[in-house]
Amino acid sequence: MGKVYDWFEERLEIQAIADDVTNKYVPPHVNIFYCLGGIVFTSFIIQVATGFAMTFYYRPTVTEAFASVQYIMTEVNFGWLVRSVHRWSASMMVMTMILHIFRVYLTGGFKKPRELTWVTGVILSVLTVSFGVTGYSLPWDQIGYWAVKIVTGVPEAIPVVGAPLVELLRGSVSVGQSTLTRFYSLHTFVLPLLTAVVMLMHFLMIRKQGISGPL
C-alpha cells in the first residue's frame, strides 16, 4: 500500500495538496457565526444527493407529477425520509444563507479587497431563491400551481417586454406542461450547475484572500 501511495505522491504531490487544504490560518476573532457559509454548502450537498435520488421516481408531467410524489412518500422505501430531508435542508439552506449574508455585512466582509467574493455571494443568494421557486412547483399540487402562476405573472406589469417575458418563463401563454418542464430542467440541471460553478469561484476567492479581519 505504501508503494502505491509513493507512486501517486511522486507524480501528484498529494501531501502538499493535503497540507494546503487542511492547514490554514484562522484569525482569533472567528466564532461560530463564521460557520454559516459552511452550513449553506452542506445543505446544498444534501439537496443534490436527495434530489438526485428522487429523480429516479419523479415524473415531470402535469398528469403524473403529483401522483409520483405521493408514490415517493408512500411506496418507495424511505422515500418519505429522502423527500423530508430534501425539504428540511432546503429550509436550512435559505435560513443560514440569510444569516450568513447578515454576518458578512455586519462584520464588513464585503469591503476591499473582497468585493468580488461579495458579488458571487449575492449571485448565490439569487440562485438559492430560484431553487425555492422552481422546486415549489414540482409536486404540481394546488399550492405549487398557483404559486407558479403568480410568480411567472409578475413580469407582466413591465412595459413592452412584460408579456414576452411571461411567455418565456411559462413556455406558453398559460401555465401548463411547458412550464413544468422548464421549471424541472432549471431545478435539476441548470441551477445546480450554475450554483456549483459560482460556489467554486466563491471558495477559491476565500482561500486566496482569507477570512476578513475584525471591525
UniProtKB/Swiss-Prot annotation:
Binding site for heme c: C35
Ion transport listed as a keyword: no
Membrane-related topology note: Multi-pass membrane protein
Subcellular location: Plastid, Chloroplast thylakoid membrane
Gene Ontology molecular-function annotations: electron transporter, transferring electrons within cytochrome b6/f complex of photosystem II activity; metal ion binding; oxidoreductase activity
Family, per entry: Belongs to the cytochrome b family. PetB subfamily.
Biological function: Component of the cytochrome b6-f complex, which mediates electron transfer between photosystem II (PSII) and photosystem I (PSI), cyclic electron flow around PSI, and state transitions.
Note: Heme 1 (or BH or b566) is high-potential and absorbs at about 566 nm, and heme 2 (or BL or b562) is low-potential and absorbs at about 562 nm.
PANTHER family: CYTOCHROME B
Protein name, as recorded: Cytochrome b6
Species this chain originates from: Staurastrum punctulatum
